[in-house]
Structures are given as C-alpha cells and as structure tokens.
Amino acid sequence: MKLYQTLRGIVLVSTGCIFLGMHGGYAAEVPVTSSGYENLLESKEQDPSGLAIHDRILFKVDEENVVTALDVIHKLNLLFYNSYPHLIDSFPARSQYYTAMWPVVLESVIDEFLMVADAKAKRIATDPTAVNQEIEEMFGRDLSPLYAHFEMSPNDIFNVIDRTLTAQRVMGMMVRSKVMLKVTPGKIREYYRKLEEEASRKVIWKYRVLTIKANTESLASQIADKVRARLNEAKTWDKDRLTALVISQGGQLVCSEEFSRENSELSQSHKQELDLIGYPKELCGLPKAHKSGYKLYMLLDKTSGSIEPLDVMESKIKQHLFALEAESVEKQYKDRLRKRYGYDASMIAKLLSEEAPPLFSLL
C-alpha cells in the first residue's frame, strides 16, 4: 500500500480557528527515565515568535527509543502538507487541523514506534532508496516548503516516512500470513450462501395501478371487470388497446407509472392488494371501489432477488473477507505490542483529555 493512501485514509478536517505553533527544531536532549510517561509535561524550548514548543516525552518504547511531542508534530506536518499543500501559509487552517487530528496521530505514531521496534527485533528494514522514492512521490523533489514552513530537516522527513513504511511492512507481513490461512475456499462459499439467502428474501414487485372512471359507479364497475378480464386473458400490458376499450364503453382510463419496489418499500395497502393477485396465472385482482373510481392493481412481474454466480462473486467476497479478517488480526497484533512494551491506554487518555491542549498552546 502506498504511503500517501494511508495518509489520505485519515479523516480530513475542515479549516478554521486560530493557528497553534508548530516548530520543528529539537531542544536539548531530554533525560529518559524508566517510566514511559515521566517528564510528560516538561517544556524544553520556546519559539522567539511567541509560540510554544513542546519536545516532551510521551512514551518510552525502550532504552533507545522514545516518542516525543515533536515526533507527533512532524507527522502532523507531513499529513497536513500532503492533504492541503495550498493551505501551508494558513495558520488558522493548520491550527484547526492539528488540534483535531492530534489524538488520532498520537496513537498512530506510538503504534508505529512499537512496530518499528518489533521490525528491528525481526530484522525487517526498509530500503532507504524506497523511502526517498516515496518522499519524492508524495512531495516532489522540492522540499523547501517543508523546510521553510515546518523547519523540518531532510533527516526529519526521512525518519517519518521510513518509520511509516517500516510499520506498514511489518504489519503487512504479520497480518497477511494469518489472514490467508483464515480466508479459505470454505469460508468464501459459506459467505456466498449467506448472500444468496439474503437476496432470496428480497421480492421485487413491478406493477401499475389503474383507475376506471365513468358517469356512474355501476358503469365504472362494469368497465373495470372487462379491463380485468382482458388483462388476465391476454397476459400483456397494452395501454392503447385498453384505453380504446374503456372509451368505447363510456369510461376513462387513468394509469400510474410502472413501480418497481422491494417488500420493504411497499406501502401496506399496496402489499395487501398485490398479495391477492394469483400471479402468474393472472395479472389483476378484483376491482376495488374508490372515491375516484374503480381501482385495479396490475402485477407485471414478481421476482425474488438474486446474486451473480459464485465464480463471478468469488474475488469480491475474498477481498471483503480479507479486509474483515485483516482488521481483526491487525488489532490483535497492535494489542500484543502494546502489552509487551507497557503501553498504558489510560495514561494516553489522560494526556489527550488534560494535557494535550497545553502542547499546542499560545504563550
């Protein structure tokens, strides 16, 4: 999967509000303690322009790798520029985007760090050439806007993309092998039978409602009986011939458009009338007196829903089941990594609810 597709997959937010400072420069090194959540609120640097800079430790993966607020900011920078390059000069747009996306991106960055650590243990790496190609595909060869507006160095950009690609690679390897074992031909056939059963419960009704009018109710009833007899005998709908018949008897024919509806779309009154018709032996049931004349329900077709043959549907079903299983396996893999490295979701929830706003606050 291309990285830019992953970036596009994150929900985009409309622009607005006040710009919150985003500075790419690293501060002096923050001492790492044994706890992944200590030093959570230490501020290391301040932008001369008056915007707060927060290179705080958010999570400690191991002795060599920690997730800082700056890692999240760098990811937000690239996501924003990839989605809205034309708004790179808009402080309000960046403010709205960063504030709204911070919770989502924080968790994704932590998961990426965990997967990169797992990839390292499994000796899985991404070719630097592939990383550079991805950067060029996403942003072109001119990266000066990223340097100028986000103060990100080439190495900063490389690290974000390398981490994302490596996480995608190890995730793909872990997920695909397990999912392929679960999406078996038997599972595909079972899902196809389920679709067949669902389709068979859908009945499609195609019908018209005819109204016969005349000077008297008695005459309208007689003409309606003749129209019903003609339709049930001919088994075809010929509006011109029926109109001529009604006019010759001193009446007027009004016909509705042709309806094509499923059971769930039918009104109760129409459903009751259509059920009384002995289709396909007859097209019309008995005429019903109405204030506007006599009504006839003419059933042109009644079919059960169906789906394409298995050999046509197999590929689509396989893709659908693969996606469902992949989502489940991916969650299980992430949960195992979080448990292994001591990820505490409650601490992250606290960070998001209580401490995230100061990370992007104005002085």
Curated annotation (Swiss-Prot):
Biological source species: Chlamydia pneumoniae (Chlamydophila pneumoniae)
Keyword Nucleotide-binding: no
Taxon lineage: Bacteria, Pseudomonadati, Chlamydiota, Chlamydiia, Chlamydiales
The entry's keywords: Signal
Keyword Signal: yes
Segment forming the signal sequence: 1-27
Descriptive protein name: Protein CPn_1058/CP_0792/CPj1058/CpB1100
Gene3D superfamilies in alphabetical order: 3.10.50.40, Porin chaperone SurA, peptide-binding domain (1.10.4030.10)
Family statement drawn from the similarity comment of this UniProt entry: Belongs to the chlamydial CPn_1058/CT_355/TC_0634 family.
Entries under InterPro entries matching the protein: PPIase_dom_sf, Trigger_fact/SurA_dom_sf
